[in-house]
């Protein structure tokens, strides 16, 4: 049974801590690690393990670090439990994802990318959207975990496709943000109040996550 298996979260910042707490509150056998010692001081409920032990003992490892460049440097350093699963929740380059997968597959370790959208609020409330580079059947045993941390989970079939989807997602978000900046400047040049602009957009077809959450 999955709840009897050791699950670990590497990276306990705002996103990772939210994910850890979701699983901790449902009584999973969960451990954590973060390079920042203050995380341990300020979160006494977290069961900490050093990286060597996490890789040695864990059945499932959730990686919530800045990018998979950090992951590649770490996995070459430690021996990883055979038949364990690494779920990469970072926003990363797909070619690096494929490189990591090729390395780990030779060691009988499964690795999948599962990029996140929803921010720290989504991690805390379990309402993330996950973009997964795998077939759904490959992660059936972890459905309970995925359902606890995400409201929407999409499977794209092959390793790297989850991270590719996140890059497309971010490109749209950043593009809309830049356009909103330009439109805001143009509105001010036309003597239109920025607050009025955003209020109008948010109740019309021009509304977006960016206009609702990032402006003014």
Residue map of PLM features:
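Rossmann-like NAD(P)-binding element
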Residues: 51-80, 85-95
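Hydrophobic beta-strand scaffold residues
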Residues: 30, 48, 110-112, 153, ...
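Residues in the short beta-alpha loop(s) of Rossmann-like NAD(P)-binding domains
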Residues: 35-36, 67, 135
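NAD(P)+-binding Rossmann beta1-loop-alpha1 motif at the extreme N-terminus of oxidoreductases
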Residues: 1-56, 60, 83, 120-123
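Rossmann-fold dinucleotide-binding core
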Residues: 91-171
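Helical "substrate-binding/catalytic lid" subdomain
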Residues: 161-216
């Amino acid at each position: 049974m999955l709840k009897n298996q050791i699950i670990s979260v590497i990276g306990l910042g705002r996103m990772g801590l939210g994910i850890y707490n979701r699983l901790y509150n449902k009584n999973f056998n969960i451990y954590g690690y973060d390079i920042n010692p203050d995380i341990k001081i300020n979160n006494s409920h977290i069961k900490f393990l050093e990286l060597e032990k996490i890789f040695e003992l864990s059945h499932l490892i959730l990686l919530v670090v800045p990018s998979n460049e950090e992951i590649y440097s770490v996995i070459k350093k430690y021996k990883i439990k055979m038949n364990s699963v690494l779920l990469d929740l970072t926003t990363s380059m797909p070619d690096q994802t494929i490189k990591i997968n090729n390395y780990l597959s030779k060691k009988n370790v499964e690795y999948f990318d599962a990029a996140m959208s929803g921010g720290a609020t989504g991690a805390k409330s379990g309402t993330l959207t996950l973009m997964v580079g795998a077939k759904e059947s490959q992660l059936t045993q972890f459905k309970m975990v995925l359902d606890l941390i995400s409201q929407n989970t999409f499977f794209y079939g092959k390793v790297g496709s989850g991270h590719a989807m996140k890059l497309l997602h971010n490109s749209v978000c950043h593009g809309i943000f830049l356009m909103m900046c330009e439109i805001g400047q143009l509105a001010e040049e036309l003597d239109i109040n920025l607050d009025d602009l955003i209020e109008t957009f948010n109740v019309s077809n021009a509304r977006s996550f960016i206009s609702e959450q990032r402006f003014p």
